[in-house]
Amino acid sequence: MQALIFDVDGTLADTESAHLQAFNAAFAEVGLDWYWDAPLYTRLLKVAGGKERLMHYWRMVDPEEARGCKVKETIDAVHAIKTRHYAERVGAGGLPLRPGIARLIDEAGEAGLPLAIATTTTPANLDALLQAPLGADWRRRFAAIGDAGTTAIKKPAPDVYLAVLERLGLEGGDCLAIEDSANGLRAARAAGIPTVVTPTAFSAQDSFEGALLVLPHLGDPGEPMPQHVPGAANRWADLAALRAWHHGTLIEAT
């Protein structure tokens, strides 16, 4: 394992509730009579990308209106307002990283293991989420960052992963990806990257066929995984465990 590549939303932090609240706040601000509840948003998450999700929903509820000439302009405006609301919610550090994430980032830095990000979210959302827990210079901790500002085609297409691999100068099999959703898993696997999946409540019902390992989270000494996982000396993932899993076979833990 020569590099570790993280997805962001749902993987680094359980962000989807904050995104959902931000979407609904944006709808109210612009006067749209839309409201997304958690079950609906769970289904909409099958569509990667916030703007793409908005267009998909618009076509669901009013196909004729969704063909209008100002639809793109409206979606851009709603998404910009949503991004502002999201940044306000997470920017003060109110959204913690998931168990194991901060520790693994530190361990990788100490070991000289390159880290990367492969996400469909925007650079603004990345900054809002990561500045508080990792510091204003958080980007320096990652050898490559692929996001919505660098790669237009969203997951499950592998484009963002392929772009990150090119920047790292590595093959897919040299790396390990950490994802939380079926779309993310499909994208990473299409790029040839072995993948560990840590679902959230919004993705727990996804199919993770082809994942190297499925875990509730990566664990920490103070918040261990519910059970021991083969290849891990403790009930949390450290670099030694990740390397063991990278070279291992299909295991599933719940």
Swiss-Prot record:
Signal peptide start-end: none
Superkingdom of origin organism: Bacteria
Pfam family of the protein (one): Hydrolase
InterPro entries per the UniProt record, alphabetical: CbbY-like (IPR044999), HAD-like_sf (IPR036412), HAD-SF_hydro_IA (IPR006439), HAD_sf (IPR023214), PGP-like_dom2 (IPR023198)
Molecular-function GO term, any one: hydrolase activity
Family: Belongs to the HAD-like hydrolase superfamily. CbbY/CbbZ/Gph/YieH family.
Protein's recorded name: Protein CbbY, chromosomal
Organism: Cupriavidus necator (strain ATCC 17699 / DSM 428 / KCTC 22496 / NCIMB 10442 / H16 / Stanier 337) (Ralstonia eutropha)
Gene name per UniProt: cbbYC
